């Protein structure tokens, strides 16, 4: 028996489909997506920004929680995976809410800022390649409104961020460790890290 939110049938089907995929472990945890959906309803999200779509689980979960006029801006570079995401959006009846940008996310974020979209988003999720995380964060901080939330996935890197790395550690480890340590001192946000999935940090913009 499940305690908490019931999983939408389309999301359940996608999760089952990805269980047998060799990269299926890249998908956001069901509990994390449920939390994002809950947050979207709590703070009445109308515009959602997602960096790293993969096969569309989190974008679908949040889009389902948005009002009919809600908008999702989705950033990715992988056509193969986002084709699955498009199928999922169609099946869930949310494709009309979602705008997919297939180019490096930093380009899309800079375009949005240049187009006057600063402080217009209510919620953002960073769930992409780890080295640019600090750059993604700074752009999202410009794009999210005061009182909005920036969520960052995989902040624990399977627990590796809690330990000193060695010469075999990926560059992303040091970058994420430094970034994580900087958040409590950042006066622009109120951070909290939850041990859900591979670690989810929520940043409330002041």
Residue ranges: model-predicted function:
Residues 1-125, 130-151, 155-206:
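A short alpha-helical cap/connector motif
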């Amino acid at each position: 028996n499940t305690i908490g939110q019931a999983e939408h049938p389309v999301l359940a089907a996608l999760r089952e489909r990805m269980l047998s995929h060799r990269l299926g472990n890249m998908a956001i945890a069901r509990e994390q997506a449920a939390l994002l959906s809950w947050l979207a309803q709590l703070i009445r999200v109308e515009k959602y920004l997602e960096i790293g779509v993969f096969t569309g689980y989190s974008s679908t979960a949040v889009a389902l929680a948005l009002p009919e006029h809600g908008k999702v801006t989705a950033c990715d570079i992988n056509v193969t995976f986002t084709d699955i995401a498009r199928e999922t959006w169609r099946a869930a009846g949310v494709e009309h809410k979602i705008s997919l940008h297939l180019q490096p996310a930093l380009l899309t974020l800079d375009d949005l800022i240049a187009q006057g979209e600063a402080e217009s988003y209510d919620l953002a999720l960073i769930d992409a390649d780890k080295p640019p995380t600090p750059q993604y964060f700074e752009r999202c901080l410009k794009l999210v409104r005061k009182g909005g939330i920036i969520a960052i996935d995989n902040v624990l890197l399977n627990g590796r961020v809690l330990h000193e790395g060695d010469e075999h550690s990926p560059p992303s480890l040091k970058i994420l460790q430094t970034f994580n340590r900087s958040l409590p001192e950042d006066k622009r946000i109120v951070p909290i890290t939850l041990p859900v999935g591979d670690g989810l940090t929520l940043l409330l913009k002041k």
